[in-house]
């Protein structure tokens, strides 16, 4: 119970066992087909055990029905390409890569990859018998249809909370924090108490959006417009909460335009609350951006009505923070409208800076999928690396099985499929229990086969062994899974063809060969896995963020042309997020770098630059170009230094920041002082973000937890 709360794993194992045995017995004993029976059983194993299908029971059933034609296609190709070893190996490499690389489309496709791989592996071995293809397809169809029906009728799993609802909870909690800060700024003493009470729940709700806190299938990571928009809105919400805490710490009753800032914050809270209602399904109408846009116009007008000349720069900070929150809220609401399929304003991003922040809203679905496929088609992408690693391993396994004429070469490929991990270290760590388990299972199977039990005994024992095996794997580890699956295979083959103790011997040999192939490929193809790529990807991301800082200040200060720094940084951030997601699935010693803080620093640079370029006039700060350039170069150089250190694995690059340079800021620029304050708030925030990279946050430090909330980090 401790390892399986609610008995979800046991229920799933029982459901798959019942369906697999029913399909196998129907084909073997009722329809009397030794060809259909294995395909019915392994079709259920492929889709019910090796595949991880998310969603409600009805959604999983629909997914099974939708993937059935893909299964027909792969079984047909495997059957036809088994004519020679060369064609089978070529097909294994091509389709092994294609099926694994399809995972760039999102975790839902990743969950189907291993199962669909098995559907090609199963028929790609001799004998070449295209005449039996219809029997193979019929067996697969029976198994998948029975499994689809069982998903909604036999001990169905609970429907998980949709991501949209979780996002609604986080945005609603954010709205309460914003409203409490507005009360604080309006002089209401209860505002501070309300904020202190609301912040823990808001932090928990925001952290619940982290990919690491979600089942893979619920993460909004597909190539489609809706998932991209939900992920963008979640990133804005998490960023907003972190900056709301910064606002709560600003205690300046003499701040310029304090009443206007409080009014803007209250409108921001109201817009966030309306967005939360729609996300949770409590409102039918999707909120628009008109209200927050009007509030931003009113705030700027109120701010422009007060001359900042001669005022200390610190008195302008609060208004700049409030303005940034309003801009990010506008971006969040726009992303939610995209997720809802509602119209949004035209994209006004300059051609030189395309694609813009919400570029995906203006692309077709086919265009979005092509963009996702193309952007990861690089050796620097962990999706590309993983697909190529698996395709090579499966192709080599199929080649050796054909060259040495292994009697059950299918098991070699199945071993590779189930044991190969993303790093060489993780692959090696799975070998010992897998080999020990396989050997133990094979010894028991050999004894049983030597004794020579009647087929009826195998038929009766199969469901029991299968149930325990399917439940033991997730609960007790790969050793138990391999041991019991070896027995399952022996009991299955004993019912479809004459076998003896040599079947167990072949099983051990095939698993050893498959394990050796997995280790060899793991050592040759990107052996560090996510760790090695994460250093490179995050280093590149921070270097790109440095260019964003320089370019943004250049555009706003001296009206320089906006180039491609932002699009490059968005692309680098996407690859860094993918690398971090893979890194989290692997085993690593305690990190010397806070990877969450590293990603947050990059995302804050990108999001802040987007807001500044939308809301600030360009070329208005020439009189203070020298100190502004010095401040920007200080931050950009630090980003570049940390990025280079990550690329070189130099821990000294993440050492605490030196003191910021002492600069003489003008106080007589008129209204342009507000634009200067907006820029300085952004740059100061980026320095704070960089200062957190060298330290690992304590789990119970609420302020630090909030500071590490941004975009998809972790």
Language model regions located:
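Cytochrome P450 heme-binding "Cys pocket" and the immediately downstream C-terminal segment
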Residues: 519-520
């Amino acid at each position: 119970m401790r390892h399986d709360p609610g008995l979800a794993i046991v229920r799933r194992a029982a459901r798959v066992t019942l369906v697999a045995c029913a399909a196998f017995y129907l084909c073997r004993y009722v329809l009397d087909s030794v060809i259909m029976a294995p395909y019915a059983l392994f079709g259920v194993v492929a889709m019910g055990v090796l595949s991880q299908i998310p969603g409600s029971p009805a959604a999983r059933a629909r997914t099974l029905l939708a993937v059935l034609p893909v299964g027909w296609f792969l079984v047909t190709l495997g059957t036809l390409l088994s004519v020679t070893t060369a064609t089978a190996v070529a097909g294994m490499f091509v389709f092994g890569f294609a099926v694994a690389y399809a995972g760039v489309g999102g975790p839902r496709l990743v969950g189907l990859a291993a199962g669909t791989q098995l559907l090609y592996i199963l028929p790609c071995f001799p004998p070449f018998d295209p005449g039996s293809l219809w029997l193979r397809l019929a067996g697969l169809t029976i198994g998948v249809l029975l499994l689809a029906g069982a998903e909604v009728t036999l001990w169905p799993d609970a429907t998980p909370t949709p991501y949209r609802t979780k996002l609604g909870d986080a945005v609603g909690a954010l709205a309460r924090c914003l409203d409490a800060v507005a009360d604080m700024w309006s002089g209401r003493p209860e505002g501070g108490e309300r904020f202190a009470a609301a912040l823990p729940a808001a932090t928990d709700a925001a952290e619940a959006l982290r990919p690491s806190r979600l089942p893979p299938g619920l993460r909004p990571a597909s190539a489609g417009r809706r998932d991209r928009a939900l992920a963008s809105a979640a990133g804005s919400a998490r960023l907003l909460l972190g900056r709301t805490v910064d606002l709560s710490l600003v205690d300046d009753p003499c701040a310029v335009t304090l009443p206007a800032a409080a009014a803007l914050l209250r409108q921001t809270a109201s817009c966030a609350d309306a967005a939360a209602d729609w996300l949770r399904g409590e409102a039918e109408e999707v909120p628009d951006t008109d209200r927050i846009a009007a509030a931003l116009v009113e705030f700027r007008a109120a701010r422009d009505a007060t001359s900042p000349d001669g005022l200390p720069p610190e008195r302008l900070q609060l208004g700049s923070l409030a303005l940034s929150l309003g801009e990010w809220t506008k971006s969040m609401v726009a992303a939610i409208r995209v997720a809802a399929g509602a119209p949004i304003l035209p994209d006004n991003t300059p051609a030189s800076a395309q694609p813009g922040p919400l570029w995906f809203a203006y692309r077709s679905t086919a265009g979005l999928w092509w963009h996702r496929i193309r952007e990861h088609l690089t050796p620097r992408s962990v999706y590309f690396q993983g697909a190529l690693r698996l395709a090579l391993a499966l192709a080599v396994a199929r080649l050796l099985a054909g060259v040495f004429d292994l009697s059950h070469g299918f098991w070699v490929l199945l071993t590779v499929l189930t044991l190969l991990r993303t790093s060489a270290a993780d692959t090696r760590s799975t070998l010992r229990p897998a080999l020990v388990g396989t050997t133990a299972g094979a010894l028991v199977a050999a004894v049983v086969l030597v004794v020579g039990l009647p087929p009826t005994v195998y038929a009766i024992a199969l469901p029991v062994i299968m149930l325990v095996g399917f439940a033991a794997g997730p609960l007790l580890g790969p050793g138990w899974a391999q041991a019991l699956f070896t027995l399952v295979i022996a009991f299955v083959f004993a019912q479809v063809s004459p076998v003896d103790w040599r079947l167990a011997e072949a099983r051990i040999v095939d698993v050893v060969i498959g394990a050796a192939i997995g280790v060899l490929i793991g050592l040759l193809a990107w052996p560090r896995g996510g760790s090695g790529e994460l250093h490179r990807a995050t280093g590149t991301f921070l270097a790109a963020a440095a260019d964003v800082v320089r370019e943004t200040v250049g555009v706003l200060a001296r009206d320089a042309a906006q180039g491609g720094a932002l699009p490059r940084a968005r692309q680098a951030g996407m690859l860094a997020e993918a690398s971090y997601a893979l890194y989290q699935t692997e085993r690593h010693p305690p990190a010397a770098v806070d990877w969450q803080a590293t990603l947050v620093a990059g995302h804050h640079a990108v999001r802040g630059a987007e807001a500044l370029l939308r809301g600030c006039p360009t070329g208005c700060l020439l009189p203070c170009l020298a100190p502004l350039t010095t401040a920007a170069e200080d931050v950009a150089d630090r980003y570049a230094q940390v990025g280079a250190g990550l690329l070189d694995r130099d821990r000294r690059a993440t050492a605490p920041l030196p003191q910021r340079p002492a600069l003489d800021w003008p106080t007589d620029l008129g209204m342009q002082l507000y634009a200067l304050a907006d820029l300085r708030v952004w740059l100061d925030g980026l320095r704070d973000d960089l200062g957190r990279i060298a330290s690992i946050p304590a789990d119970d430090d609420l302020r630090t937890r909030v500071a590490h909330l941004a975009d998809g980090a972790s």
